[in-house]
Structures are given as structure tokens and as C-alpha cells.
From Swiss-Prot:
It is an enzyme of class 2 (transferase). Specifically methylates position 2 of adenine 2503 in 23S rRNA and position 2 of adenine 37 in tRNAs. Its cofactor is [4Fe-4S] cluster. One of its GO terms (molecular function) is rRNA binding. This is Probable dual-specificity RNA methyltransferase RlmN. It is found in: Cytoplasm.
Length: 357
């Protein structure tokens, strides 16, 4: 029987669970210290926790529910990990180096059902949600790697932009956020965390009401319904008429800036007229809007799309700026490895399938 990951419990939940099992509440703080400060990888290493408590934890929880299957390192310091879960499923996690610190991109689902026509993540459909513990454990595995190579570095930023739709796994995603933000543990600042959604409007309202101080990014990729439906099938169910009011509510409720993710596809959504249309869509909240322009990473299975030319990227950027919309072009990481989200996982599954025949 599979045991849940110990990393899925918030400090409050762990305190409550241990108390119900007859242990003193302070044991939870001790365990958390071992997990997140000393970062041990076995329960046996928790030397100031009594034997009965350790045996109970070991019987009830896993501290290593996933194993590293593949690791790719880029010349720029980016590392892409492929982890194998207890059920054999594969997920991706990426470590990126920035001037401001180390950022980890985590996965929230095994596969994805959103079906964006340019994305490698949706090549294999969703089979299940990840638990909160499995999401946290991705960060811990990256941190353990950093500890092992002796760099004395810590993960300082987190982006929830890996495989899957985070808002389709809402409760586990929120538990994950509460674990990594806790000052008793990883203590990753809320403003150093960004969650991305393809636009599940009802969950955007819910997320706004939580007022977590976490950054929100919307994967928009088109300034009108016709084009967005063409490249993102979710727009059929949640068109801009439903999405934009949710974005308005988020901005007004939180008074926080929102990031608009916009992947540039040559001849599809990268022309000046579309930049003007995008600027108009956000003109009433442009002071709280930032557009992240993303050069396309080609995916073999999506050969219909090509990367925009540098001239078209510059024109799009300049047009947004001239129309009062703050924007930037995303700095690329890991271009010499399987950089596109879901690409490494898809290749490994194909490789395993061929080997099994």
C-alpha cells in the first residue's frame, strides 16, 4: 500500500495528527526542523525524536515517495529532473538560475487535459493529480541535490508552471503553497512564488479571496476568442467574456499585479495588430498588468508552429510599450536540453514504450 508523503502536511496538520496519536504537540516542530532545516532523507536521522514517534511516522508516511529517473544539465546551469512516482508515473521539475536566486518550476498533475496546441505537456493526457506532498517533494529533491553537490545554495523562488493545470488541482496546490511559505520550514516568501493558470475563471475568484500574496500568471496567448480557441481548446468553455471579469476581480480584490503569459508563434499571434488588440484588452488595468512574451520552443509533435522572428518579437514588444502596457521578453533557460515543458517526459515515455516492445 502506498504511503502518503510526509511533505504534504502543513505544520498545523502535523501537530494535530501527532496529538491524535498521543504525542506531544512540540514533536511536530521537531520533525519539521529535521525535514526542512536539516533536510534529512530518512526518519532514522531525526535523533531528538523518540523511537515510538519515529516508528509511527515511518509506518504512516513516505519521506522519499519518488526517485530520480533522468537528469539533464544545461550549459547555463539549468537542470531538468525527471522523477518517477510510486506508481511508475513520470513528472518533470526544473531548476533555473537567475541573478536574483534559484527558481524551481514544479509539476502539479501527471499529464494535462487543457490541450494547448503548442505545448508538449498535453501530448499525454492527465492520469491523476499530484498530492500536496508530491509537489513539495519536488522542491525538496532539488534542494537535496544542491546540498549533495556542496554549493550551499537554497531554492528561493518557485513557479507553479510545470505539467498540468494547477487550478484543476486547487486544494492540493493551496496546501503546497502553505507548506513552502511557512517560516518554520522552507520559508519561501509569498512574493517569490508564482502560480500559472490557463484561465479557470471560477478558481481565479476563489484564489483571489484567499489573499495569499502569491503572484498569479494567466496563460492567455491570444487577444481574441477566435484565435485563443484555435490554440487553446479551454477557450471554448471559458471564453474571454468569462475570463476577463475573473481577472478584473482578482486585480481589484488583491490590488496585486497580474502577469499575462503570451507565447509568440510565427504568423499566428505575433503581429502588430494583435499587440494593439492585446493592449486594448488590458487598457483599464494596465498599471497592474505585466505581459511576459515567450519565444516559442519548437516541439516535434507540433510542427505546425514556428518560433517568431526576432524582428516580429521586437515589434510586438515595442507596440505594447507604446500602448502603455508593461512587458518583457522571457529570458530563456536550458535551450541545449529538452527545455519545453513536458518534452523530456514525452521523450522518456516513448523510449520506454519502444524498449518494452
Amino acid at each position: 500500500m502506498n504511503k502518503p508523503s510526509i511533505y504534504g502536511l502543513t505544520l498545523e496538520q502535523m501537530t494535530e495528527w501527532l496529538s491524535h496519536q498521543g504525542h506531544k504537540p512540540f514533536r511536530a516542530k521537531q520533525v519539521w526542523d529535521w525535514l526542512y532545516r536539516k533536510r534529512v532523507t530518512t526518519f532514522a536521522e531525526m535523533t531528538n525524536v523518540n523511537k515510538d514517534c519515529l516508528e509511527l511516522l515511518d509506518q504512516s508516511f513516505a519521506i522519499d515517495s519518488m526517485t530520480q529517473a533522468v537528469k539533464q544539465e544545461s550549459a547555463d546551469g539549468t537542470i531538468k529532473f525527471l522523477f518517477k512516482l510510486y506508481d511508475g508515473s513520470l513528472i518533470e521539475t526544473v531548476l533555473m538560475r537567475h541573478k536574483y536566486g534559484l527558481s524551481v518550476c514544479v509539476t502539479t498533475q501527471v499529464g494535462c487535459n487543457i490541450g494547448c496546441s503548442f505545448c508538449a505537456s498535453g501530448l499525454i493526457k492527465k492520469s491523476r493529480d499530484l498530492s500536496a506532498g508530491e509537489i513539495v517533494e519536488q522542491i525538496m529533491n532539488v534542494q537535496h541535490h544542491l546540498d549533495a553537490v556542496g554549493k550551499e545554495e537554497r531554492v528561493s523562488h518557485v513557479v507553479v508552471m510545470g505539467i498540468g493545470e494547477p487550478f484543476d488541482n486547487f486544494d492540493n496546490m493551496v496546501d503546497f503553497l502553505n507548506v513552502i511559505k511557512d517560516h518554520n520550514g522552507l520559508a519561501i516568501g509569498a512574493r517569490h512564488i508564482t502560480v500559472s493558470t490557463s484561465g479557470l475563471a471560477d478558481k481565479i475568484y476563489k484564489f483571489a479571496d484567499l489573499k495569499l500574496q502569491v503572484n498569479l500568471a494567466i496563460s492567455l496567448h491570444a487577444p481574441n476568442n477566435e484565435l485563443r480557441t484555435q490554440i487553446m481548446k479551454i477557450n471554448r468553455a471559458i471564453p474571454l467574456e468569462k475570463l476577463m471579469p475573473a481577472i478584473d476581480y482578482y486585480v481589484k480584490t488583491t490590488n496585486r499585479k497580474i502577469t499575462i503569459e503570451y507565447i509568440l508563434l510565427r504568423g499566428v499571434n505575433d503581429q502588430k495588430a494583435q499587440a494593439i488588440e492585446l493592449a486594448k484588452l488590458f487598457e483599464d488595468k494596465r498599471h497592474l498588468t505585466y505581459v511576459n512574451l515567450i519565444p516559442y520552443n519548437p516541439v516535434d509533435e507540433h510542427g505546425q508552429y514556428q518560433r517568431s522572428t526576432s524582428e516580429d518579437i521586437s515589434t510586438f514588444y515595442d507596440t505594447l510599450k507604446k500602448n502603455g502596457l508593461n512587458c518583457g521578453v522571457r529570458l530563456e533557460h536550458g535551450t541545449d536540453i529538452d527545455a519545453a515543458c513536458g518534452q523530456l517526459r514525452s521523450k522518456q515515455i516513448k523510449k520506454d514504450t519502444v524498449a518494452a516492445k
